[in-house]
Amino acid sequence: MMQSKSFRKLGVMAVGAAAMVSTALSDAAAQAKDKFVYGVPSAISSAIANFVFAKELGYFDQENIDMQMVPLAGSAVIIPQLLSNQIQAAGASLEPLVIARQPGKANFPLKFVYNYLRNSVWEFAVTANSPVKTVADLRGKTIGIVSLGSGNVYTTRAILAAAGVPWDQVKVLAVGFGVQAFEALRSDQIQMLNLWESAHASLEVAGTPLRRLEYPAQFQGVSSHGFEVTDALLKDNPGLIARFGRAASKGSVACIANYEGCLKAFWKHYPEQKPKVGTEEEILRKELAIMVPRMQNIGYFAPGQPKRWGEYAERDWTVLIAALKAGGEVTDENIPLSSLYTNALVPEYNKFDSAAVEAQAKAWK
């Protein structure tokens, strides 16, 4: 009898232990975060400080997301990574997908789900003392671009045409970016540099005063980049995209509320990105001058426009399609806009208390 009782007791203990293990495994499974790899369309820099600040403040944790970032250069790399599910989303320029919708083109099963860079990052920069005062003054001048295959060239061409400057009335020189591009402008090899805002800011920080030419009105305040995902992910797991977009939106709000804290959080996670030369105050001032213009383009909303993070306007696409047609890349303008983007998840992106996020950001030390 004693032996029988002992066996019964051991049996109860074993069942209890098994139940505890099962519960623990269930809890662990419930707590496992969803992996989300975001493709950064450039090298790691303070341009992604808003994502890092979002991680630092716990916004991705709150959405149960393990967010990772990988630098990727150009659509030739980004698109295969998306299609092979190596990354879940990418910050991508809009042009390649529009071109892919043309007859005979690849017609990739991709879609933009979030308007990220709400105001184009591309600028027309001239030296501060340049005789070029308007876009119309570029007739007969040489303009510097990243490469002849750069996606923004089509819009540049359309902007010049709108100002009465035919493409064959300017010279175009591929200068890359960085030292060689800046030297081309300083030496008057080119009279206008057509890079993105943070690249131009870097040149100014290095000691070359610049002036930006004003775009024609129809090209102002239109998107240049967004979050691109596969149609399959959008169909199968829209909730994951919504959670990612909400955390990213909160990161943007937080960074804009506390630029200095946002930059310091970026350096905390990427210490190798912090410049080594200069005093702490000088380093902070110079890097903020580079970072802030990017955050302003992320947070751009036209006067009176509802502040709905991630939302596209139809104009973002119609202006681009017209520009690509002017550049010869689009022959058929009748592209269903629903094949390019969706605003379906915008309400989910904006389900948070902006004031609370701003307060948390300002309190971060």
PLM features per residue range, with description:
Residues 130, 180-280:
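Pocket-lining segment of extracytoplasmic ligand-binding domains
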Residues 237-330:
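Secondary-structure end/capping motifs
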Residues 2-14:
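Bacterial N-terminal signal peptides that target proteins for export
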Residues 68-69, 281-290, 335-347:
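Short linear loop/turn motifs
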Residues 31-197, 208, 213-221:
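Short, glycine-/small- and polar/acidic-enriched structural segments
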Residues 20-28:
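C-terminal segment of classical bacterial N-terminal signal peptides
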Residues 7, 134-135, 337:
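Structural motif detector for alpha-helix initiation sites
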Residues 314-365:
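Conserved C-terminal helix/tail region of periplasmic/extracytoplasmic solute-binding proteins
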